[in-house]
């Protein structure tokens, strides 16, 4: 398939943005030699490839005219492959846009995802979900206002969207397991009887199950393995995950109940050096992860999952902050509970073999403190991680 070259686009905002009768694509990759935008039909067949322009300040860009919402796409990034230097570029891997707001297709575990010598040339596109271009979602918030309940008066109820609504006998059968079920009169009445002022939803961003679970015929029910930090999980939607999530928030707010999200920015599903290349590893491994100082082919494992997101790097930090702002401004959530929050405060010290020691003044904490979009939002930290120095209670 011959690549066409896209007209120049804008380097900001990152992700896919509809404007002027087309879509602007912007993707960060500091070490890439080339970036290719791959377009797919609804059956998962690749129909076009477009060469991106750049980089400009490490951002590759392009404008695809005469298209818009619903376009299905992924990226291929070519660059040096040298794990000993922390470089893992591989154009055989179709990569998910970290800024994807909706996904198409299901993730399937397959050896073509794995970063092994015997699978380097294997194409993984058939087993990857793709990003879907979304525009401005039309939704009537009907004057929605945050309840703004003081923390000292809050009664926070941790709940799994599917588990809670599946188990409640008065939630309509067709709504069980969904965002709409959480917004049903029966669910809200139950919460009100308990005196709940806020629901803390276990992870509702798109996630995948670990390979070891799949091999045992199981799944990661809880969702602590996030694949798309901007996309509401389709498992809990009937048709439109974005607007059904918004409807849930609006209804809960209408009854004085806040919505707090349990978020997992400390690691990704890409695991350790033997894990799959799905997005960040293939886009810019050195930027997104804490790597071993002694051997950058290995990852610093502060999370117990195989990798740790480097929130002190500006591009990883920008992704996290952009995601938080999206959920606050576009989805009207009232707060966040940060899983293994100590990881987000780990920074690399000069002349140290430790790639990340905890610092209470780390870039992530400073960024959150100064962001006006997050002012007044409830912020809850799990004050530890799985490594030395991480217990910060």
Describe each region flagged by the PLM:
Residues 30, 373-375:
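Proline-centered flexible-loop/turn and helix-kink motifs
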Residues 1-235:
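N-terminal structural segment of carbohydrate-active enzymes
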Residues 352, 360, 365-369, 376-393:
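Polar, glycine-rich mid-to-C-terminal structural blocks
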């Amino acid at each position: 398939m011959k690549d066409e070259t896209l007209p120049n686009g804008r380097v900001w905002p990152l992700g896919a943005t509809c404007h002027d009768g087309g879509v602007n694509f912007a993707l960060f990759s500091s070490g890439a030699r080339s970036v290719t935008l791959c377009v797919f039909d609804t059956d998962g067949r690749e129909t076009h490839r477009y060469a991106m322009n750049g980089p400009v300040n490490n951002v590759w860009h392009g404008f695809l005219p005469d298209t818009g919402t619903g376009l299905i796409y992924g990226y291929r990034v070519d660059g040096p492959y040298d794990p000993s230097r922390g470089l893992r570029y591989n154009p055989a891997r179709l990569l998910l846009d970290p800024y994807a707001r909706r996904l198409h297709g299901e993730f399937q575990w397959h050896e073509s995802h794995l970063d092994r010598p015997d699978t380097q040339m294997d194409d993984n596109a058939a087993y990857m979900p793709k990003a879907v271009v979304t525009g401005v979602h039309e939704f009537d918030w009907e004057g929605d206002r945050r309840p703004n309940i003081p923390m000292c008066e809050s009664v926070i109820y941790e709940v799994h969207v599917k588990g809670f609504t599946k188990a409640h006998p008065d939630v309509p059968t067709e709504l069980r397991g969904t965002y709409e079920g959480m917004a049903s009169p029966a669910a809200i009445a139950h919460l009100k009887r308990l005196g709940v002022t806020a629901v803390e939803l276990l992870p509702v961003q798109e996630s995948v199950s670990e390979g070891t679970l799949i091999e045992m015929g199981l799944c990661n029910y809880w969702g602590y393995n996030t694949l798309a930090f901007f996309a509401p999980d389709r498992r809990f939607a009937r048709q439109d995950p974005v607007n059904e999530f918004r409807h849930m928030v609006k209804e809960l707010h209408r009854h004085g109940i806040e919505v707090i999200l349990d978020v997992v920015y400390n690691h990704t599903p890409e695991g350790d050096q033997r894990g799959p290349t799905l997005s960040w590893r293939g886009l810019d491994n050195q930027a997104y992860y804490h790597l071993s100082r002694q051997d950058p082919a290995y990852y610093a494992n502060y999370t117990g999952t195989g990798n740790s997101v480097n929130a002190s790097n500006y591009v990883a930090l920008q992704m996290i902050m952009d995601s938080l702002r999206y959920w606050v401004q576009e989805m009207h959530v009232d707060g966040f509970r940060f899983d293994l929050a100590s990881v987000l405060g780990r920074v690399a010290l000069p002349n140290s073999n430790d790639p990340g020691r905890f610092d209470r003044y780390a870039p992530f904490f400073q960024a959150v403190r100064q962001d006006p979009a997050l002012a007044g939002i409830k912020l809850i930290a799990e004050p530890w991680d799985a490594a030395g120095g991480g217990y910060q209670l």
